[in-house]
């Protein structure tokens, strides 16, 4: 016992003398030449990083360029850093109708993602991530046209089931339907652009979008006055989670051609789920969405929120889920789209931004400061 006590200071000094594990660094570039640790494909760099099982950060610097590939991040502590969203672009053109082959359960929507993040502690910055499926050409086809693709979802970024503590900043996430699929745990998107039209920010994840732009893109079909052109959010937050999709201090904008008073802030998504007594819309997916101190353009519909159909117990899409039965909240809205009709939204248990931050940043100090 005495000997151990005498040796304790020695081991303490030795521990202090051991340097911290250095981060690993790789480069992705359209042309590497003789440069070491350089790859022409992003997935090759990520695969090499995954083979490194040490508990340190791996930084992958992605040079300016246009990268057409489908990418998955499955290693923890990855930092993906582009040259700027106007210089570095990752894109892929998969669509849900045919993308099941890319997914572990043959599901087309998550399979369509240009970038899948399925790991803890991931930072993505300085890059555009785009699903380039030709949505508008397909949208213009008549329903009876055999060339029309019915499942036209095209995800740009999938936050998959094992993702947590994902920070996306100074980035552009571009698509049309289902641009950002939040299907994991915590994520923060900061100083970025997210664009799309149909339910283009959706899922059961806990996401804070702050100091960003949410831009509605056009449709190829004419929308009658009073009808909904697009929907920003479609949360499917489980009841046990107090935070779903929170948009803070951001601007809601539109492309030219998107009509006034035509875009809903959100609608409740109850995903079709298999239970012991059948397959139907999940009654426990009571979506939570908040808009806090946001500037809303004139394209926002005066009702602000709307309903969404789901799968009934008989298998038909006749179950209707209303915003009044969801966890929708807004406060501090400004701009021409801020005024709205009272449609009976009464839920008052939303967390304020301080509480949202406290909930999301527990054990994640790196994301707490802009």
Residue ranges and their predicted role:
Residues 23-370:
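Sequence-level preference for short, compositionally simple segments enriched
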Residues 1, 21-22:
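Initiator methionine at the very start of the polypeptide chain
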Residues 1-8:
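Bacterial N-terminal signal peptides that target proteins for export
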Residues 17-19:
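N-terminal signal peptide c-region/cleavage motif recognized by signal peptidases
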């Amino acid at each position: 016992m005495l000997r151990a006590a005498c040796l304790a200071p020695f081991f303490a000094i030795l521990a202090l003398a051991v340097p911290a594990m250095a981060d690993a660094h790789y480069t992705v570039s359209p042309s590497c030449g003789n440069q070491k640790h350089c790859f022409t494909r992003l997935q090759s760099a990520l695969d090499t990083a995954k083979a490194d099982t040490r508990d340190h950060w791996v930084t992958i610097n992605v040079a300016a360029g246009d990268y057409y590939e489908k990418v998955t991040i499955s290693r923890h502590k990855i930092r993906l850093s582009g040259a700027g969203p106007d210089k570095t672009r990752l894109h892929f053109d998969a669509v849900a109708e045919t993308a099941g082959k890319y997914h572990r359960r043959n599901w087309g929507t998550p399979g369509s993602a240009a970038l899948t993040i399925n790991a803890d502690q991931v930072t993505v910055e300085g890059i555009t991530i785009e699903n380039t499926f030709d949505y508008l050409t397909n949208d213009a086809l008549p329903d009876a046209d055999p060339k029309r693709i019915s499942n036209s979802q095209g995800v740009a970024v999938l936050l998959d089931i094992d993702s947590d503590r994902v920070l996306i900043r100074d980035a552009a996430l571009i698509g049309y339907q289902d641009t950002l699929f939040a299907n994991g745990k915590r994520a923060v998107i900061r100083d970025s652009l997210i664009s799309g039209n149909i339910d283009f920010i959706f899922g059961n994840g806990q996401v804070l979008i702050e100091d960003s732009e949410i831009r509605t893109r056009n449709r190829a079909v004419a929308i009658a006055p009073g009808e909904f052109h697009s929907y920003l959010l479609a949360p499917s937050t489980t009841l046990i989670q107090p935070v779903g999709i929170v948009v803070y201090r951001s601007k809601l904008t539109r492309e030219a051609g998107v009509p006034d008073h035509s875009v809903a802030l959100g609608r409740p998504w109850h995903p079709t789920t298999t239970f012991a007594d059948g397959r139907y819309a999940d009654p426990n997916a009571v979506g939570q969405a908040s808009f806090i101190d946001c500037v809303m353009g004139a394209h926002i519909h005066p009702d602000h929120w709307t309903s969404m159909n789901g799968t009934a117990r008989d298998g038909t899409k006749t179950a209707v889920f209303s915003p009044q039965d969801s966890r929708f909240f807004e406060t501090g809205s400004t701009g021409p789209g801020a005024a709205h009709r009272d449609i009976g939204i009464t839920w008052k248990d939303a967390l304020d931004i301080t509480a949202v931050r406290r909930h999301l940043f527990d054990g994640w100090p790196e994301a707490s400061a802009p």
